[in-house]
A protein has these predicted regions:
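A compositional/biophysical signature of low hydrophobicity enriched in polar/charged and small residues
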Residues: 1-77
């Protein structure tokens, strides 16, 4: 069963579009957009299991230059 998550990302000021472009290139990320509101980017990612999803977030998203913080919400339905 595939695990899907919405990831809310905060970036350094003025970096949202650049960071979103980099995040789109991460394997497992199906979408990443710069948005308005309390967070700078919303991304959707999928992985075969929770462990792999965690690795994707930590190694693939949080390691992108300009990412300050992320909040991951796993889809429940």
């Amino acid at each position: 069963m595939t695990v899907k998550a919405f990831i809310l990302i905060d970036t350094s000021p003025g970096k949202a579009r650049e960071v979103a472009n980099k995040i789109r290139q991460v394997k497992g990320v199906s979408m990443a957009h710069a948005v308005t509101g309390p967070h700078d980017i919303i991304a959707i990612a999928e992985a075969p299991d929770v462990t792999t999803l965690g690795e994707l977030v930590v190694q693939g998203i949080q390691s992108v230059a300009g990412v300050n913080r992320s909040l991951t919400s796993i889809v429940a339905d």
